[in-house]
Amino acid sequence: MEKTFNLTRRDDGIAILTMDVPGETMNTLKAQFGPEISEILAEIKSDSSIRGLVLISGKKDSFVAGADISMLDACKTAGDAKALSQQGHVVFNELEALTIPVVAAIHGACLGGGLELALACHQRVCSDDGKTMLGVPEVQLGLLPGGGGTQRLPRLVGITTALDMMLTGKKIRPKQALKMGLVNDVVPQTILLQTAVEMALAGKRAPKPVKKSLVNQVLEGTSFGRNIIFDQATKQVEKKTQGNYPAPAKIIDCVRQGIAKGMQKGLEVEASHFAELVVSKESEALRSIFFATTEMKKETGAEGASPRKVKKAVILGGGLMGGGIASVTTTKAKIPVRVKDISEKGLSNALAYAYKLLDKGVKRRHMTPAARDNLMALMTTTTEYKGVKDADIVVEAVFEDLALKHQMVKDIERECGEHTIFASNTSSLPISQIAEAATRPENVIGLHYFSPVEKMPLVEVIAHAKTSPETIATTVAFARKQGKTPIVVQDGAGFYVNRILALYMNEAAQLLLEGQSVEHLDKALVKFGFPVGPITLLDEVGIDVGAKISPILEKELGERFKAPAAFDKLLSDDRKGRKNGKGFYQYGASSKKAKAVDESVYGVLGIKPGTNKDAKAVAERCVVQMLNEAVRCLEDGIIASPRDGDIGAIFGIGFPPFLGGPFHYIDTLGAANLVKILESYQSQFGNRFEPCERLKTMAQENAHFF
């Protein structure tokens, strides 16, 4: 059996320990490595000719990407998970206890257990390459660093910086890592090994004191000050997580106890807390999302089809969506883009939008001005169909007008090649209707982005009956290159995301008209786990946009999609939301720093906010509508699987990740329980709450999605 760790000795007394997991593109730490590492460390200790040790990766662009997450699923009990953490502690403590200098030479991803391995070394040097990132992202999986990270990181970079890294899971770039004292040096990759060897030859050095602000020096230097840091961190965490995620509080406790009672006690607490989190329902849900997205990356979206390479893209429309799509195509996919708009103003807006996003990177020193300018050079513009003939894909982002989109299809078929894909960014019009104008309907597909494009990770790839498998596969690959998570959905009004969102939003509107206040509604759903409440979301998306989509959904899908008529009064009062500074909340000069409701909205709607219902009951009424419709979408074949439905809801509308998505959450609730809740609401409020057939069948059979 091939080994993962190989020790080679140099003539100068420095040994190189190379980690290279056989048959894998990236290094990950596995439980079975423990004995192998211990054996090598024993060999090093017994060889007096070894004066120093350099730990390096044999992989091209990865140091260690973290622990193998599948190990956690093998843990049947908290005791199994605790043993896993303790095994890591034993190995890393052995490494740290070596009397010779140990240097980690880092190039590429150094994350999670990989960074904990590097922290157990006496010094660290990393490459200045863009692929090099350091971090402890375990919190994003509902976990904490279980290999000593909660103890070694605060001692190296300070409590405040360490908590920030562990509570956010952020990735640190090389220069930032040097500045914060996480690494001792940053060098070009070409001299990484040489530098690490020189550091090992120079011997162990006491770590440089971390540069801290005066406030942090004072706070971290006394037990009273440290308590202030921990208390503030706890308050911020509670506000952000609404008590829905247990990991952050446990991370704070590990650091607090380790600093107060010593490293040994800290490691004991870390192992116990890690074990509790591994078997928590929140971490299981978050890990299911991780596995789902990893699995989806291997799929083409159309079985048996291979994607064609996209060498050039055209974007029709220079508005917010068009500008955003053009921007991610050049900056993330590195694909040349031609933006076409009928007005010079639209084109200059698209260029300005892309420049502004790139310039943020320059200001944060994430890229050089030259790199920004090179990426901007990939974007060109035209008011006519010039320079579009060789486009492999055309993304249409014009107004939601069927006649206009028909004209775009005809123009593109006339101006471009026979293989050119026409992808419409429509949010509501059926793709089959857009394809009616095409002589090559197999090339027509939907590609629905969410706003703002550069931030929202999801895209819906919408296939109509005649879309070819190659068109689907090429569009999915194109979206992935843009840094997006694509889900393939079938054609139908609202597709998947807007369809499940519409009923949720409509129910929130009904509750508002029944007398629930705007703040109470929003707070109830944020407490449930959504990033923003439904009324805030309506203001952000645009009340006018909601008003355009609702009739389309009602016409195609039936009475249950009928929006409350009272909302027409908002448009009559010129309330569109944030975009025109007039909606449910105050904007502009009249708004205070804390978001305040525009109380005049109640008068416009002809209601008085009365006694607020229990927040859980408010959230339940909105959420069960979304759950029921998600199952209906599966029933109708709009989505291919519960997995796709979970990913679409989490990445498209911020469904609470700790619940795992609508389908995982239904499994947690139980189909029979959900049917009972829906039928109770149906008896009170009518047939919009009628459970779909699949749910009823599942309730009878006590079935699950996963």
From Swiss-Prot:
Enzyme Commission code(s) on record: 4.2.1.17, 5.1.2.3, 1.1.1.35
Primary subcellular site in the record, as a coarse category: cytoplasm
GO molecular function, one term: 3-hydroxybutyryl-CoA epimerase activity
Subcellular location: Cytoplasm
Residue ranges, annotated region (Enoyl-CoA hydratase): 1-188
Transmembrane segments: none
Entry GO CC: cytoplasm
Record-linked InterPro entries: 3-OHacyl-CoA_DH_NAD-bd (IPR006176), 3HC_DH_C (IPR006108), 6-PGluconate_DH-like_C_sf (IPR008927), ClpP/crotonase-like_dom_sf (IPR029045), Enoyl-CoA_hydra/iso (IPR001753), FA_oxidation_alpha_subunit (IPR050136), FadJ (IPR012802), NAD(P)-bd_dom_sf (IPR036291)
Pathways per UniProt: Lipid metabolism; fatty acid beta-oxidation
Known function: Catalyzes the formation of a hydroxyacyl-CoA by addition of water on enoyl-CoA. Also exhibits 3-hydroxyacyl-CoA epimerase and 3-hydroxyacyl-CoA dehydrogenase activities.
Record protein name field: Fatty acid oxidation complex subunit alpha
Source species taxonomy: Bacteria, Pseudomonadati, Pseudomonadota, Gammaproteobacteria, Alteromonadales
